[in-house]
Amino acid sequence: MDRIIEKLESGWWIVSHEQKLWLPYGELPHGLAANFDLVGQRALRIGEWQGEPVWLVLQHRRHDMGSVRQVIDQDAGLFQLAGRGVQLAEFYRSHKFCGYCGHPMHPSKTEWAMLCSHCRERYYPQIAPCIIVAIRREDSILLAQHVRHRNGVHTVLAGFVEVGETLEQAVAREVMEESGIKVKNLRYVTSQPWPFPQSLMTAFMAEYDSGDIVIDPKELLEANWYRYDDLPLLPPPGTVARRLIEDTVAMCRAEYD
């Protein structure tokens, strides 16, 4: 699936190493390969954006390597492809040898996979399903400040799905563990690939059922009910958390304005 890049090759360039992106001038490289010293490099076509190919190059650059978070404010489709590139680059880097027999592996030519020629084992990129849920109580939404994000941002609750657990069960468990409350009338909203490092966010809205807020101090600094027109600092646009909050605010405005 990969090929040697030629002088006149053009498109969007995802140059990635160890979960970092090359972002000259703070942007994804776009244009001719020759303009970015990529001629002769091996590249993998991982998609298309606005009629142009998106290429993945597994390479470290000495300068301007940054997080894919830096392009989160770009169009959702381009951010998604950048995330795909970073995740695939890390997958290929971390699966050079077979976990069963220890022999070297090689990329599949037909799908995103690594193959072992010795024991015939096949590996696919790991995807970790997560739930994220906006909880409404009359004209208010439950927002929390997470221990791992000490930047003042308040967001909705989220967590990983455990083995043998449905998405609905994961919502109920995570909400109870982190905030001590029960929810009802759960409704699926949307999903978002989230390459930090390889999550798939499944987004829900729910209504408060019962209980008082009792936070898990290992997960949260604080949590509280916030009226829809008096909210704290929120996650940035482009995140599924921000969409859930805005959808909840819109519902509250329709009822209480």
From Swiss-Prot:
Residues bound to a divalent metal cation 3: E174, E178, E219
SUPFAM superfamilies: Nudix
BP term (GO), one: NADH metabolic process
Motif (Nudix box): 159-180
Reaction(s) catalysed by this chain's protein: a 5'-end NAD(+)-phospho-ribonucleoside in mRNA + H2O = a 5'-end phospho-adenosine-phospho-ribonucleoside in mRNA + beta-nicotinamide D-ribonucleotide + 2 H(+); NAD(+) + H2O = beta-nicotinamide D-ribonucleotide + AMP + 2 H(+); NADH + H2O = reduced beta-nicotinamide D-ribonucleotide + AMP + 2 H(+)
Domain Nudix hydrolase: 125-248
Top-level enzyme category: hydrolase
Signal sequence coordinates: none
Classification via InterPro entries: NAD-cap_RNA_hydrolase_NudC (IPR050241), NudC-like_C (IPR049734), NUDIX_hydrolase-like_dom_sf (IPR015797), NUDIX_hydrolase_CS (IPR020084), NUDIX_hydrolase_dom (IPR000086), RNA_Hydrolase_NudC (IPR022925), Znr_NADH_PPase (IPR015376)
Recorded superkingdom: Bacteria
Record note on cofactor: Divalent metal cations. Mg(2+) or Mn(2+). Binds 1 zinc ion per subunit.
GO MF annotation list: magnesium ion binding; manganese ion binding; NAD+ diphosphatase activity; NADH pyrophosphatase activity; RNA NAD-cap (NMN-forming) hydrolase activity; zinc ion binding
Stated family: Belongs to the Nudix hydrolase family. NudC subfamily.
Quaternary organization: Homodimer.
Function: mRNA decapping enzyme that specifically removes the nicotinamide adenine dinucleotide (NAD) cap from a subset of mRNAs by hydrolyzing the diphosphate linkage to produce nicotinamide mononucleotide (NMN) and 5' monophosphate mRNA. The NAD-cap is present at the 5'-end of some mRNAs and stabilizes RNA against 5'-processing. Has preference for mRNAs with a 5'-end purine. Catalyzes the hydrolysis of a broad range of dinucleotide pyrophosphates.
Protein name: NAD-capped RNA hydrolase NudC
Organism: Salmonella schwarzengrund (strain CVM19633)
Gene this protein is translated from: nudC
